[in-house]
Amino acid sequence: MGVLEKIRDIEAEMARTQKNKATEYHLGLLKAKLARYRAELLEGSSGGASKAGAGFDVAKAGFGRAVLIGFPSVGKSTLLSKVTSTESAAAAYAFTTLVAVPGVLEIEGAKIQLLDLPGIIEGAASGRGRGRQVVAVAKTADLVCIMLDATKPDDQRRQLEHELEEIGIRLNRQPPDVVFKQKTAGGITINCTVPLTKTDERTVRGILQAYKIHNADVMIREDITADDLIDTILGNRKYVPCLYVYNKIDSISLEEVDRLAREPHTVVISCELDLNLEVLKKRIWQKMGFNRIYTKKRGAEPDLMDPLIIKKTEATMEAVCDSIHRGIKHKFKYAVVWGKSSKFNPQGQRVGLTHKVAQDDVVSIVTKV
């Protein structure tokens, strides 16, 4: 029996099994097996991925990468040509884009690579069409933009989320707060700092055994599910922010536009009428989580034309130094910062390498002679 057949059998058994406290352990083991077989399926295809055609090995460019993912003919190519200087072939029929087409989106002084990927079809993660390659490229992204047709049913969104989930991409989620450490002896030790309501210790041990893990320390700091534990054990999941972009709002009612616009992580646009494209750009910038930092030489005005772009999660003075030149931090003496992160704003504050900078701060770095 092949891997695909095993996956289908497990999915069928899970569909037949009622979800309750009595079946929790059994379902947990089935999920562990399913995740293992899906990983085997993807690893088995990775060797031939580079030979499958041109256009998928696209080098990263700019300060980050956002990918456009969606079913064929939702308007990804049109959007790319509208917001970047790149032309991606667009037509009124499906499967126009056959390779990954990169463009550069300029927002708030930052250049962000925007990739128009071939249209995903249902079953992509199982190898249909070129979908598995498409979703694998999405794993390299700093932001996923799922493009949807506002005139079509809501299940298109669920199908795309399912395909991305199967390939190991987790949208708008944080990694589970679980510390998992394998060891050579001593058995399984499980410590929980919170009550577990979505799984139990027996299921946790069963999942570990399903992966042939017999010696490990597990510290659980949040109320996790069996899926969260499996994600932690595998360690190859990608947690990515996601924007849901509904196109063709010029073809639906105002009430429907209002309903979609109120959904979380959602932007509504019309490529045909150029509606909300600037709003989309701003939301992409916000979702990617960048800080714009300006530099200032001693005795000179701040350089407002060429800002440094730094991820908010890494926005320390050390990261500012690395953005200029990696050798600067070794000669660093101190820095003066003006802006939101300064205690004395609008006056400057003298800070060290660990100081966290904020959006639109101005920094002046003093080095040792």
Label every PLM stretch briefly.
Residues 2-211:
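Conserved G1/Walker A P-loop phosphate-binding module
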Residues 16, 22-64, 69, 74, ...:
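C-terminal-of-GTPase-core extension/linker across diverse P-loop GTPases
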